[in-house]
Amino acid sequence: GYDVNSLCQQLEKKQLIGKDSARLKPIHDNLGSRRYCFSIYDWTSGFFPGNLWYAYQLTGNEEFKKEAVKFTNYLYPLREYKGTHDIGFMMNCSFGNSYRLCPVDSVRQALIQTADNLCGRFNPEIGCIRSWDFGKWNFPVIIDNMMNLDLLFYVSHLTGDDKYKELALKHAETTMKNHFRDNYSSYHVVSYNNDGTVEKKCTHQGQKDDSSWARGQAWGLYGYTSCYRESKNAEFLRQAENIAALIMRRVKTEDAIPLWDYDAPDMPQTPRDASAASITASALIELSTL
């Protein structure tokens, strides 16, 4: 079960308010001696408010609710941000959990506006949501984008409008077709030409273009689990199960915290990725219930 006291101590430690309203989200400590805050436009900005909402859900402690509201409100400008696919989980982790636990109309409207902006990054000719607006690619789509689909599913439920869900599932279908190899490992980046053909398959964070970046495999597993939950399409279930089987075969560590890339050398000094393990565990728990 949860060590609630330990979780609460970590969150209390990280409640820091900076002078710059755009740099208020604690990210990590350096040996416990220095605190870093990143911009609200960083892709992880919704995680800390989301953690506070979960702490409130677990404990009922009103202080966590108060802090969750405060740190969620700092992200309110993101409802108008159109510059990345990551607005999906930046807002869903924060505002999504806020509305789930304490529904108010302003939060609902922020979620709908964000979903509309995310839909604006969808290209119907390609069948995908564009990930980045930088770099050398024509229309880059990264496997991480599967995590942003939950916002579209959620807003479909909020509004009763299936257009969000249908767009998300189309993205998932295109990604399933082009991102995955025969063994169900995935490329990190697939870039498309304007006519929908593939321009390039490569990596931006993995060890090499044809390796299996650990967090990327976890993103895919989580995303296709969500897609099956929302659609009951057996193809998505098979995809999730096959990705899970790949991960189980490839994990080389006794504690199941993988090397940062499944093709990285299995040596003591090779970094490991606890976030990949956490995402995988969360996906497997949900997959076991479907």
Predicted regions and their residues:
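Glycan-recognition and catalytic cores of secretory/periplasmic carbohydrate-active enzymes
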Residues: 1-290
